[in-house]
C-alpha cells in the first residue's frame, strides 16, 4: 500500500529548499538600494571605460563543444550507480548498459565526423 506519510521528510526538505531561495531574492529586492543611472547601464571592464561594444557573439563551435561535454557528463552520472551495483544487478543490466554505451559511442563518432570536437 502506498502511504504518503512515509514521504513527510522529503516534502519538508522540498518545501524548505524552495522557500529559502525565494525568501533570499525577496529580501534582497526589498533591502537593496535602488541606484539607476548611466553608470549602471554601462558594462564593467576592469575599472576602465568600455572599449567597443559589450555584446559579443560566440562561435557555434563553443556551444557544440559544451553540448558534447554535457552528453558525456550525463553518461557518467548514469553509469556510476550502475558500476557501483554491478555485482547485484546481473547480466541483463550489463547488456542494457552495454547498449547505452554503444549508442553513446555511435553518437561520439558522429560528432567527431561532423567536426564538433575540433577546437580550431
Curated annotation (Swiss-Prot):
Listed EC numbers: 7.1.1.-
Disulfide bonds: none
Catalysed reactions, as listed in the record: a plastoquinone + NADH + (n+1) H(+)(in) = a plastoquinol + NAD(+) + n H(+)(out); a plastoquinone + NADPH + (n+1) H(+)(in) = a plastoquinol + NADP(+) + n H(+)(out)
Bilayer-crossing regions: 9-29, 64-84, 88-108
Subcellular location: Plastid, Chloroplast thylakoid membrane
Membrane topology term: Multi-pass membrane protein
Biological processes per GO annotation: photosynthesis, light reaction
One Pfam family cited in the UniProt record for this chain: Oxidored_q4
Family recorded in the similarity comment: Belongs to the complex I subunit 3 family.
Protein name (database record): NAD(P)H-quinone oxidoreductase subunit 3, chloroplastic
Naturally occurring in which organism (per UniProt): Platanus occidentalis (Sycamore)
Amino acid at each position: 500500500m502506498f502511504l504518503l506519510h512515509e514521504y513527510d521528510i522529503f516534502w519538508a526538505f522540498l518545501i524548505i529548499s524552495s522557500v529559502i531561495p525565494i525568501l533570499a531574492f525577496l529580501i534582497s529586492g526589498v533591502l537593496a538600494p535602488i541606484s539607476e543611472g548611466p553608470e549602471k547601464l554601462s558594462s564593467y571592464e576592469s575599472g576602465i571605460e568600455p572599449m567597443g561594444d559589450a555584446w559579443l557573439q560566440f562561435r557555434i563551435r563553443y556551444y557544440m563543444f559544451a553540448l558534447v561535454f554535457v552528453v558525456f557528463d550525463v553518461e557518467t552520472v548514469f553509469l556510476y550507480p550502475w558500476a557501483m551495483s554491478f555485482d547485484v544487478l546481473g547480466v541483463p543490466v550489463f547488456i542494457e548498459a552495454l547498449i547505452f554505451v554503444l549508442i553513446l559511442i555511435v553518437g561520439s563518432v558522429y560528432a567527431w565526423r561532423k567536426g564538433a570536437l575540433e577546437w580550431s
